[in-house]
Curated annotation (Swiss-Prot):
Gene Ontology MF terms: acyl-CoA dehydrogenase activity; long-chain-fatty-acyl-CoA reductase activity
UniProt key word Lipoprotein: no
Chain's gene name: luxC
Family (UniProt): Belongs to the LuxC family.
Keyword Glycoprotein: no
GO-annotated biological processes: bioluminescence
Pfam hit, one: LuxC
Protein name: Long-chain acyl-protein thioester reductase
Keywords: Luminescence, NADP, Oxidoreductase
The enzyme's E.C. designation: 1.2.1.50
Catalytic activity line of the entry: a long-chain fatty aldehyde + NADP(+) + CoA = a long-chain fatty acyl-CoA + NADPH + H(+)
Enzyme class, spelled out: oxidoreductase
InterPro entries per the UniProt record, alphabetical: Ald_DH/histidinol_DH, Ald_DH_C, Ald_DH_N, CoA_reduct_LuxC
Amino acid sequence: MNKKISFIINGRVEIFPESDDLVQSINFGDNSVHLPVLNDSQVKNIIDYNENNELQLHNIINFLYTVGQRWKNEEYSRRRTYIRDLKRYMGYSEEMAKLEANWISMILCSKGGLYDLVKNELGSRHIMDEWLPQDESYIRAFPKGKSVHLLTGNVPLSGVLSILRAILTKNQCIIKTSSTDPFTANALALSFIDVDPHHPVTRSLSVVYWQHQGDISLAKEIMQHADVVVAWGGEDAINWAVKHAPPDIDVMKFGPKKSFCIIDNPVDLVSAATGAAHDVCFYDQQACFSTQNIYYMGSHYEEFKLALIEKLNLYAHILPNTKKDFDEKAAYSLVQKECLFAGLKVEVDVHQRWMVIESNAGVELNQPLGRCVYLHHVDNIEQILPYVRKNKTQTISVFPWEAALKYRDLLALKGAERIVEAGMNNIFRVGGAHDGMRPLQRLVTYISHERPSHYTAKDVAVEIEQTRFLEEDKFLVFVP
């Protein structure tokens, strides 16, 4: 099966080229996706786009809500096509693909959550729309301008989130899709066009693709005109973004991270196992927040292990795995054999839907992902802390939730960036941080308009007449 995906330039779908010389292909097993080769005209149109988005925030959020209502409709053609593409090309199960589409609708339709996102990260939901008085100044946040998003394919929703952040801050979005997921950003942009092809939000979007090998001169030209770059992916992708971005702009890096789960002597073993299994299974451990290790403290360890296996089997039915190709199956088998040879205890599903490897803390051979988890029985939190690493550890899920209150300071000081209840690793709560930052703050420029000299300050209750102060040598008179 072959699929053609056209570029979208400034909210308009480009005509797919007829010549094979102007087309590039991405293979997905027996299937292929064909995309245009980026050309000078497209790059020029992207760079020349200079329409200021003067919409109020409520206009933007209402538009996103309207788009989200379409995604909520299970008969919406874009949604149906998107689900089919995730299954056919990316190997998603029906349940996984449907859940991805459901989350897109949830995010777009959560008007309150979008308002709160802006308020929490920028300080006020009005700060993008008007000048706000703050002490002795007025302040307003303006968009950086051209935001270039280098997306990854392991977590489709990360691309949606990246785009929405730029839209909420009124930036132009130049989206470079991933070779492993050329579908999500394209489907989202097409749904904007369906609602209103002339809407400023629609017109601010461009969705393209380029390879990092070969001639990247046009890609470099786009990068050199960026006002901010949002880079997702592995070390190579992050390094490429840093290398080709202008030296004076901000590169927001969402690079590779690891996450794990702490189970602290639970009373409810079933709930503990359910939460841990969810955090292992969601996205088949492809996400930075996915649990790859479980540290169990307390008694009833064997009972917990059996409950965990039971819940991994449950998730194999309610959220079936992505299809493994030949190499992935071989890697799974190899890790199993390596661990057995090393004397570790291994439980593995006959269909490779999950694997549990028991080892001491710090003993970890290879990690094939795909719902493979290392289970460590430890005595106390001190045996876990060495495996929390700054800039490397993202999410630590904890059960019971109350146990996190005991450990959160220790975990944070060691470098943990996010602490959640087990079973909640995929839901980024409003008000929280992402990889140690507030991303919206880095997508805007804060401009201050400061009050005039006759405005008296709290500590200096006279007009600020600096020339007179110098002439009369009275500066120290006004020092509080």
